[in-house]
Amino acid sequence: MKQSLAVKTFEDLFAELSERARTRPTDSATVASLDGGIHALGKKILEEAGEVWLAAEHEPKEVLAEEISQLLYWTQVLMISRGLSLDDVYRKL
């Protein structure tokens, strides 16, 4: 993988989001999304999955990568909301 100056790993993102869920900063969009519930998170994941699909068919790789990163973000927020760890998912890979 080609490294850039601002690389955040899947594990880094999960740790950051978990910390936000734990500390609940008042200005956090992640906290607001967690408070919105599973149904709203599920809708957001479906929306992002559709955007990934469309980007894969019609957009350059940079746009596709951004859409995939957003899908991963929302998937991790849903995982945290349901109490899943990365290891819970890794065991299924």
Curated annotation (Swiss-Prot):
It holds the Pfam family PRA-PH. It is found in: Cytoplasm. It comes from the Bacteria. One of its GO terms (cellular component) is cytoplasm. Its EC number is 3.6.1.31. One of its GO terms (molecular function) is ATP binding. It is an enzyme of class 3 (hydrolase). The keyword RNA-binding does not apply. Its main location: cytoplasm. It catalyses: 1-(5-phospho-beta-D-ribosyl)-ATP + H2O = 1-(5-phospho-beta-D-ribosyl)-5'-AMP + diphosphate + H(+). SUPFAM superfamilies: all-alpha NTP pyrophosphatases (SSF101386). The keyword Iron-sulfur does not apply. Keywords: Amino-acid biosynthesis, ATP-binding, Cytoplasm, Histidine biosynthesis, Hydrolase, Nucleotide-binding. Transmembrane segments: none annotated. Belongs to the PRA-PH family. PANTHER family: HISTIDINE BIOSYNTHESIS BIFUNCTIONAL PROTEIN, HISTIDINE BIOSYNTHESIS BIFUNCTIONAL PROTEIN HIS7. This is Phosphoribosyl-ATP pyrophosphatase.
